[in-house]
UniProtKB/Swiss-Prot annotation:
The record marks H34, T133 as: Transition state stabilizer. Belongs to the IspF family. PROSITE patterns: ISPF (PS01350). One of its GO terms (biological process) is terpenoid biosynthetic process. It holds the Pfam family YgbB. A divalent metal cation binds at D8, H10, H42. This is 2-C-methyl-D-erythritol 2,4-cyclodiphosphate synthase. 4-CDP-2-C-methyl-D-erythritol 2-phosphate binds at residues 8-10, 34-35, 56-58, 61-65, 100-106, 132-135, 139, 142. It comes from Salmonella choleraesuis (strain SC-B67). The gene is ispF. NCBIfam families: ispF. GO terms for molecular function: 2-C-methyl-D-erythritol 2,4-cyclodiphosphate synthase activity; metal ion binding.
Length: 159
């Protein structure tokens, strides 16, 4: 078994909506990013890549490459997952924690889980997504941005 941890953060800027966990969420602010700014999928992709010792999302999809400008993070996750499977890994489970004062994530979490399960080709029971606030402390608490942490468990596929 191999465990990976991922983290991502994006500042608010411009107009919304935002995309979190593949879900378009209406909000008056957008997130500043080279890609679509999906902190949940970026953290998850990093966790998966880390567990497989394949580096991180910035190594695979550098923000200096114009090809990834405005990229769909679901496609980045699927491509990373293809590479991880090619190394002989299967998924144990993933756990994602979104850290945001606003907007409220709870109504969108079921769809996030569906999208992540689809992209990883796994059962919904293998995907957990939750959200929390920082009780108005720090940059997320002041409404300056959104952060996310993710953990992934991989196992070597049976031969």
């Amino acid at each position: 078994m191999r465990i990976g941890h991922g983290f991502d953060v994006h500042a608010f800027g411009g107009e919304g909506p935002i995309i979190i966990g593949g879900v378009r969420i209406p909000y008056e602010k957008g997130l500043l990013a080279h890609s679509d700014g999906d902190v949940a999928l970026h953290a998850l992709t990093d966790a998966l890549l880390g567990a497989a010792a394949l580096g991180d999302i910035g190594k695979l999809f550098p923000d200096t490459d114009p090809a990834f400008k405005g990229a769909d993070s679901r496609e980045l996750l699927r491509e990373a997952w293809r590479r991880i499977q090619a190394k002989g890994y299967t998924l144990g489970n993933v756990d994602v924690t979104i850290i945001a004062q606003a907007p409220k994530m709870l109504p969108h979490i079921p769809r996030m889980r569906v999208f992540i399960a689809e992209d990883l080709g796994c059962h919904m029971d293998d995907v957990n997504v939750k959200a929390t606030t920082t009780e108005k402390l720090g940059f997320t608490g002041r409404g300056e941005g959104i952060a996310c942490e993710a953990v992934a468990l991989l196992m070597k596929a049976a031969k």
